[in-house]
Curated annotation (Swiss-Prot):
Ca(2+) binds at D158. The gene is LCL3. This is Probable endonuclease LCL3. The keyword Transferase does not apply. Residues 77-262 form the TNase-like domain. The keyword Metal-binding applies. Its main location: mitochondrion. It holds the Pfam family SNase. Belongs to the LCL3 family. SMART domains: SNc.
Length: 296
């Protein structure tokens, strides 16, 4: 004689065992994979992963050196970062900080911009004052290559040359460099990149925000009379701003500001020239011709 209810328990156990075994035999792998309970989570996970990777590669992946700047970035992408050093008055070093403060740069412990030279080595984008983060370093292409930094050159403008390789310093070169340092050093800038030049620098149009206003660094330099239009036979980049740049240079000449200022009486007595100032392009051409004569 069985106890009351014992038969039901055994029946349930048997049903559970048969259901599990039967399900293994009844459901093929094809049926399992096409089951909505399997498909929906799989698709959701795949789409989320692909989207996250896409967002990271597009907006959050840091560009440590010029060699990581892909060709499809040119004329299509802006680089946001902090200027670590300024070289000559038309180039600087940039530490790329994708996403800015929203992505944690400047306040998360693992997203702090290095302040020491060894921390910046191999991690900044070099730009001859065209965009990006500034880093006070020599404009020597060899140093740029050795440090593997993002070196940025300002697009469309040419600033007076500092003393390099035994050549004399141009008038207003130091003033132009100090002006640029005051404007962008240790500040965040956005550089719209145009191309990579022969010295492995990124030519870019750079913007810096001062209060609520965004300023075009190259344009402001022309307005201050501390740079000229870049007049090389090839390689000049202006984006859509060439007319604006040329108008700013002409206005600075007319107002006689910066390098276009006429010498004062005391400067004339001291031997200052009253001729039109030698442009950076003329300076480079003169020294190139002199170097060529020395070799012959």
């Amino acid at each position: 004689m069985r106890w009351f209810g014992s038969g039901d328990d055994e029946k349930k156990k048997k049903q559970v065992g048969e259901t599990w075994a039967d399900s293994l035999r009844a459901d093929s792998w094809g049926q399992s994979l096409t089951n909505p309970r399997t498909l929906i989570p799989t698709f959701a996970f795949t789409i989320t992963t692909v989207t996250a990777l896409r967002l990271y590669k597009t907006f959050l992946r840091r560009i440590p050196t010029v060699n990581h700047v892909k060709p499809h970035y040119f004329r299509r992408k802006g680089i946001f970062g902090k200027v670590t050093t300024v070289g000559d008055a038309d180039n600087f070093r940039l530490y790329h900080t994708p996403g800015g403060r929203i992505a944690g740069w400047g306040w998360l412990p693992w997203k702090m911009v290095p302040t020491k030279r060894e921390g910046l080595s191999n991690q900044t984008v070099g730009l001859p004052c065209h965009l990006g983060l500034l880093s006070i370093v020599s404009d020597s292409p060899s140093l740029v290559a050795n440090n593997f930094q993002l070196h940025i050159r300002l697009a469309g403008v040419d600033a007076p040359e500092l003393a390099h390789w035994g050549r004399e310093e141009q008038p207003y070169a130091k003033e132009a460099q100090e002006w640029l340092i005051n404007l962008i050093h240790n500040r965040r800038v956005r550089a719209y990149i145009y191309r990579r030049d022969q010295y492995d620098r990124i030519v870019a149009q750079v913007y810096v925000r001062r209060w609520l206003f965004r300023k075009d660094v190259g344009l402001e330099m022309l307005k201050a009379g501390l740079a000229t239009i870049y007049e090389a036979k090839s390689g000049a980049e202006f984006g859509t701003s060439e007319a604006k740049y040329r108008a700013a240079e002409e206005k600075a000449k007319a107002q006689k500001v910066g390098m276009w200022a006429k010498p004062t009486l005391l400067q004339k007595l001291g031997g200052a020239s009253t001729k039109a100032p030698e442009s950076p392009r003329e300076y480079k051409a003169r020294h190139a011709a002199a170097d060529k004569l020395k070799k012959t």
